[in-house]
């Protein structure tokens, strides 16, 4: 299947320039193509991942991806999709963010072989451009009326836009032109809000490289959820690729909780499963939705891709332990992942009567309630029911001498650490 046909089947094309020309190029040649991200934060979230998944699909089809981290454009801020001016970050923070993104993006692509990926930073070719060079060599090529008509600018005219953000599309166009000239880059990929920036780059390439210059643009549809909420968010906020911000277990759980109405679409967007494999999972969604086979496959594929096989195994282990209640099998690291969002308490490093211990920590509101819950078998320590009112909590009740997991009833968990 032609890569363009595959992207259309996956529902991953929103707009493209010269569809016939691009099809011919990718059929007949190995092309270089790029997608960029600005270092506005120290981690990508799963929404950022979408265009880079397309870039990876091109690599799998034998083409050469260029990953651009915007050390220069990140100092300005892309106005696309923003209702107000971005707050400028320090150069020091931007440099730190660049390095963090390099690490994350480095896990997604193959940097060896005939279709080896490369990673670039637009600061390298922008830092020495003087203001006079910028105005003479590039500003002269842009018509203000055309710039004002771009959606990214037009949507901000009423509330106002600074010259800094107004000029962003020129900088991004400079990137495409530079990569065309020095890396033979023929295609830019971006989200649906990047159409104006991409076409600005194509215009600049034609003016700088000649009318016969062959370059293309392709944008991806905005991914929406069936319930109308924003994709990539959970109750706890954005789903990050950085495991310190979103643990692999939380990452896995996000995908496992995908709505039946969305899961086939996500399988097409985010996994490298074949059409036949996805069709089979789609049938199971229709006939055996309670098995959640599609969600389990999606969660497994994404956790492996973004994190690792080991991280997936850990997420599965945590899920199984929480479902069965056998939490003693978990390591301290797995406990921190699986119980990140439960109420947490810090206990004294000393022995104490179970009833007193529960009340002192605040897990139980009173001794009367604590005695009642213990006596009724509603209290579990590390997965084991405790009904002994005289039980003494000591070091043997700690997992790896760090944590005690308390469960009240069927689902209410508490995590206790020690001073």
UniProtKB/Swiss-Prot annotation:
GO terms for molecular function: ATP binding; RNA binding; tyrosine-tRNA ligase activity. It catalyses: tRNA(Tyr) + L-tyrosine + ATP = L-tyrosyl-tRNA(Tyr) + AMP + diphosphate + H(+). L-tyrosine binds at residues 34, 168, 172. GO terms for biological process: tyrosyl-tRNA aminoacylation. SUPFAM superfamilies: Alpha-L RNA-binding motif, Nucleotidylyl transferase. A motif ('HIGH' region) lies at residues 39-48. Residues 352-418 form the S4 RNA-binding domain. Its EC number is 6.1.1.1. Coiled coil: none annotated. Its main location: cytoplasm. It is found in: Cytoplasm. Keywords: Aminoacyl-tRNA synthetase, ATP-binding, Cytoplasm, Ligase, Nucleotide-binding, Protein biosynthesis, RNA-binding. GO terms for cellular component: cytosol. It is an enzyme of class 6 (ligase). A motif ('KMSKS' region) lies at residues 230-234. Belongs to the class-I aminoacyl-tRNA synthetase family. TyrS type 1 subfamily. This is Tyrosine--tRNA ligase. It comes from Listeria monocytogenes serotype 4a (strain HCC23). The gene is tyrS.
């Amino acid at each position: 299947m032609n890569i363009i046909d595959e992207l259309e089947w996956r529902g991953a094309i929103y707009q493209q320039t010269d569809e016939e020309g691009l099809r011919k190029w990718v059929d007949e040649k190995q092309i270089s193509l790029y997608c960029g991200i600005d270092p506005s934060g120290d981690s990508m979230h799963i929404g950022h991942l979408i265009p880079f998944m397309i870039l990876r699909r091109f690599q799998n089809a034998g083409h050469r991806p260029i990953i651009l981290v915007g050390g220069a454009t990140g100092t300005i801020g892309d106005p696309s999709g923003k209702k107000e001016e971005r707050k400028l970050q320090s150069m020091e923070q931007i440099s730190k963010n660049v390095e963090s993104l390099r690490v994350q993006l480095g896990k997604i692509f193959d940097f060896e072989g005939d279709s080896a990926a490369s990673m670039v930073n637009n600061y390298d070719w922008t830092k020495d451009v003087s203001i006079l060079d910028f105005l003479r060599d590039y500003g002269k090529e842009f018509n203000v009326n055309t710039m004002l008509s771009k959606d990214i600018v037009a949507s901000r005219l009423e509330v106002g836009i600074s010259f800094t953000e107004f000029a962003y599309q020129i900088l991004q166009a400079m990137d495409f032109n530079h990569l065309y000239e020095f890396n033979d880059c023929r295609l830019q990929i971006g989200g649906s809000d990047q159409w104006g920036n991409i076409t600005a780059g194509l215009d600049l390439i034609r003016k700088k490289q000649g009318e016969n210059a062959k370059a293309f643009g392709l944008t991806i549809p905005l991914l929406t959820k069936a319930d109308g909420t924003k994709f990539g968010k959970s109750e706890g906020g954005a789903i990050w690729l950085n495991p310190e911000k979103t643990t692999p277990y939380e990452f896995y759980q996000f995908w496992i909780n995908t709505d039946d109405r969305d899961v086939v679409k996500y399988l097409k967007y985010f996994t490298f499963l074949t059409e036949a494999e996805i069709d089979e999972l789609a049938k199971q969604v229709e006939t055996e939705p309670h098995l959640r086979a599609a969600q389990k496959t999606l969660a497994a594929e994404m956790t492996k891709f973004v994190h690792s096989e080991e991280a997936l195994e850990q997420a599965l282990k945590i899920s199984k332990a929480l479902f069965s209640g056998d939490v003693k099998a978990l390591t301290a690291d797995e406990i921190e992942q699986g119980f990140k969002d439960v109420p947490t308490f810090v206990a004294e490093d000393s022995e104490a009567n179970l009833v007193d211990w529960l009340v002192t920590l605040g897990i139980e509101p009173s001794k009367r309630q604590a005695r009642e819950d213990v006596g009724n078998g509603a209290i579990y320590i590390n997965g084991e029911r405790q009904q002994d009112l005289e039980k003494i909590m000591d070091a043997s009740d700690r997992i790896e001498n760090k944590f005690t997991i308390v469960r009240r009833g069927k689902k209410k968990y508490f995590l206790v650490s020690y001073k």
